[in-house]
Amino acid sequence: MTDLNRIRNFSIVAHIDHGKSTLADRLIQLTGTVAARDMQAQLLDQMDIERERGITIKANTVRIEYPAKDGHTYILNLIDTPGHVDFAYEVSRSMQAVEGSLLVVDASQGVEAQTLANVYQAIDADHEIVPVLNKVDLPAAEPDRVREQIEDVIGIDASEAVEISAKTGIGIPDVLEAIVTRLPAPKGDRDAPLKAMLVDSYYDSYLGVVVLIRVIDGVIKKGDKIKMMRTGGQYPVDRLGVFTPKMKDIGELGPGEMGFLTASIKQVRDTRVGDTITHDKHGAEQPLAGFKPSQPVVFCGLFPVDTNQFEDLRDAIEKLALNDASFSHEMETSAALGFGFRCGFLGLLHLEVIRDRLEREYDIDLITTAPSVIYHVHMRDETMVDLHNPADMPDPAAIDRIEEPRIKATILVPDDYLGDVLKLCQDRRGIQIDLTYAGTRAMVVYDLPLNEVVFDFYDRLKSVTKGYASFDYQMIGYREDALVKMQVLVNDEPVDALSIMVHRDRAETRGRAMVEKLKDLIPRHMFKIPIQAAIGGRVIARETLSAMRKDVTAKCYGGDASRKRKLLDKQKAGKKKMRQFGKVEIPQSAFISALKMDG
């Protein structure tokens, strides 16, 4: 049993690439938690894709024992949380599970948008925050300027910020001392009924679902029968332990402690992040506050390039869903692409990560249709339909109005590029909410429609600011707008995978750009092919792909003109018939390129 005053629970908050996972590695290394021979970079990021992209996707915990200068040994529980906006709910749960945060800021780059988003979550969770300036060994580091920036932008005292270099190990002992002296100890009652927060869970092929927990009150022992308060599931505890980062079994976990349990849970879906775990008999009365199931925000279709791989794709998606409860999927068929799945994601990074994992870990070539968001379609008969896929749009005559999701986007940008960023946001139908300056950087807050952001906003933002802008967003609700469904017809056949929802004012430009692009991408056939963009029955843009021509009169030497005429008429009749029955093959690259467009 560990004395509560000897425990410190903390998380590390940072923007991508500011050195969060490296600092975690150093803390683990310095305290000898992992033997030197087992040490590897980004130790807590267990997926290859996390290491490769340098991002953390799932929350991970590690227990570190640290003999402090005051002669006592402290137990430090670190949660390494994701830094990206798509995983904001995982971050908020992890924040609730700890009492303090280390705010890591790159001393050469300063405060970024995601630093802000995550710090505000830490402040909301009443955290004690210790600022840490990383990368002070770089020639470009300006610790004093960044200190001022932290005070101006975030509003917390940075005069005692710890200066470190996680790469070389400078200042790491000071961080450990700051954790012990400046962060608060957890509170909790050992004799109260068990209350533990479910911080995260993942699927292990040997153990089933492994659940990361933080005990708030009471004690949990191996062999106890536990109950999930939100889902109602009851399970016996098979194993109980802590991560050092390897799994180490222990007999019990008391208040303030973090660890893992396994309880023959079959699916990750049965364990909701943020749920409350208690004993099935004499359990807690009330669950912990603040739980909300994660809702997918972005939808897109995933289809195998080779239709024979459909079964492999189904198995792969089901395996991934075991480990990711926020990822939803259902089967769909498309006339153009065959069988596939309509999948829901928390955001664009989540979509890319899942797609990369399917292609890399399961070796499946995928076609991804245009990402779309959920529209609320209010019908004239007062009912409301959630529209996930533009191809399923109800009859326009029966629709009263359509509402689209809006987001509040916070963009931090050097003021040299501010004009370009404002123009980009205006082009995407944004409404400016706020504009403030901190030193040489501007912070812009915009209200933007999510469907304008979802496709290539982030890429465009990075290109107009040469990569210097950082971006973060949160959902703020739905608003009515003049939205229409635009279809693309190739050879008079609608191509369902290219249907998109657009704003009426921008439909024509978008339609024209799309048909021009398709004209370049679709290979020529023996007959001419009209490519049209249409709203309802009205064609708004058209291009014609001319036919390949075979010279049928080549073998006529001199002779009668009517002989040539006869051959040409015969060819014309053949082409007409061909056009009537011919199928136009649209190559895979054309789908992706036609949907990725500026404007």
UniProtKB/Swiss-Prot annotation:
- Keywords of this entry: Cell inner membrane, Cell membrane, GTP-binding, Hydrolase, Membrane, Nucleotide-binding, Protein biosynthesis
Molecular function terms, GO-annotated? GTP binding; GTPase activity; guanosine tetraphosphate binding; ribosome binding; translation elongation factor activity
- Chain ranges of the tr-type G domain: 5-187
Q: Catalytic activity annotated for this protein?
A: GTP + H2O = GDP + phosphate + H(+)
For this record, the Gene Ontology CC terms, alphabetical, are: plasma membrane
- What Enzyme Commission number(s) appear in the record? 3.6.5.n1
SUPFAM superfamilies for this protein: EF-G C-terminal domain-like, P-loop containing nucleoside triphosphate hydrolases
- Chief place where the protein resides: membrane
Query: Which BP terms does GO give this entry?
Result: positive regulation of translation
Q: What CDD domains does the record tag this protein with?
A: EF4_II, EF4_III, LepA, lepA_C
Membrane topology, as annotated, equals: Peripheral membrane protein
Where does it live in the cell? Cell inner membrane
Chain residues that bind GTP: 17-22, 134-137
Q: Which InterPro entries match?
A: EF-4, EFG_III/V, EFG_V-like, EFTu-like_2, G_TR_CS, LepA_C_sf, LepA_CTD, LepA_IV
* Top-level lineage group: Bacteria
Q: Which family does it belong to?
A: Belongs to the TRAFAC class translation factor GTPase superfamily. Classic translation factor GTPase family. LepA subfamily.
- HAMAP family recorded: LepA
State the function annotated in the UniProt record.
Answer: Required for accurate and efficient protein synthesis under certain stress conditions. May act as a fidelity factor of the translation reaction, by catalyzing a one-codon backward translocation of tRNAs on improperly translocated ribosomes. Back-translocation proceeds from a post-translocation (POST) complex to a pre-translocation (PRE) complex, thus giving elongation factor G a second chance to translocate the tRNAs correctly. Binds to ribosomes in a GTP-dependent manner.
* This protein's name: Elongation factor 4
Q: What is the scientific name of the source organism? A: Jannaschia sp. (strain CCS1)
